[in-house]
Amino acid sequence: MIVLLSMTGFARAQAVWVDYAWSVEPAKENRFFAAVDKFTNSDVFKTFEGRMLINSHAANGSAPQNFSFAVVYKDLATWEATQANLNGTADWDRFRKALAANGTLVSETVYTHVAGWGEINNERFSWEGAAASVSDPANYIGRLTRLMNSNLMQDYPGSIDVWRVTAGGTPGVNHIVVFGGNSWSELESYRAELAKNVDFRAAIAGMAKVRTLLGATWTTTAASYGPLDLNSVR
């Protein structure tokens, strides 16, 4: 798997995305994902109210992770309740031990949802994440909202969501913009066509006044679990 507030607190109920990045050696992938399969079929997982995407990383620069768990909850309270429900259970303990035995946890990052547009496929999607430093969040979201509501983007073939970095993350990055689509080629082809439009280029140039891009990650969803519809978090 994207607030108008510059502070780190939660002013209202907002969706939370907790990202766990893992480095897994090829020889251990089968055991790693067998642990995922066992846990997601356990009794304790039946109480899970969020959405957990297992994403495979195709390109993320020098970062060592090749898989990540993108776990999305409708709000912070639901995440906290889930953690309280899991802690101390045998299924949760076995799951964590199995993951640690077959992979290395690289990072944990908490994001808070800001705004989003377009339809998300909950089961299978290709993702492009753009890491950014945003100096004026309200200005940036305002510009992006005007663009997304314009005729230029009426046939955009996917989703765009902006998330604020709330805890953890890469120094300097305070927002991540997530583009989702059926394929990277479809997203890139659409973007290439948009780049020919003078109004689109002007809109992007305006955003660049308050937003600096710091990196990009490409992932694809390998598996999806849980009842939460990601379209409902907006």
Summary of predicted features, one role per range:
Residues 1-8:
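Bacterial N-terminal signal peptides
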Residues 12-234:
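Short S/T/G/P-rich N-terminal loop/turn motif that feeds into the first structured element of a domain
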